[in-house]
Amino acid sequence: ATVMMASAEKLPANVVGVLADCGYTSTREIIKKVMRDIKLPANLLYPFVRLGARIFGGFDPDASSPIESMKKCKLPVIFYHGDADDFVPCDMSRENYEACASEHKRLVITEGAGHGLCFPRDRHGYYIALDEFFRPVLSSQTSDLSQNQ
């Protein structure tokens, strides 16, 4: 989620793409999802969690939203998510993918992978997808650099 939010910011020229692995859509939604998972009334308690974050943490969970950043992202983005992720729902990556404004994007769902485990679950497939996705991007960056010398 952090790299998705950073992708909407002004970044150095050497940042040529984003690998978003099992990112959530918003801090608010992931907090509420976890609350529901532990059988707490999320809609009732979330305002208190938000207040606590503002008072004790110095931040507003409603202010951080990867999906909103995706609407401004122009960098190439490859989204990975495991279909067995029981922490961040796979649908959140689908929503982030749909919201992404980049013309060069791809969503890879890894069968049987839990949260953050796409790479260990399918190393070969992960490498292949990364190579296929970023090779054209990196090739154009290399040719741009050689033309400027």
Locate predicted features.
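Acidic catalytic loop of the alpha/beta-hydrolase fold
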Residues: A84-V88, G116-L117
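Catalytic histidine-centered segment of alpha/beta-hydrolase-like enzymes
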Residues: A113-Y127
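Catalytic histidine neighborhood in serine/cysteine hydrolases
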Residues: E98-L117
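Short alpha-helix in the alpha/beta-hydrolase fold that links the catalytic acid
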Residues: P66, L75, P89-E98
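Alpha/beta-hydrolase-fold serine-hydrolase catalytic core, especially in secreted/extracellular enzymes
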Residues: R135-Q149
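Hydrolase active-site cap/lid region
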Residues: M5-D60, E68
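Short beta-strand/loop motif that positions the catalytic acidic residue
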Residues: K72-K74, F79-H81, D85
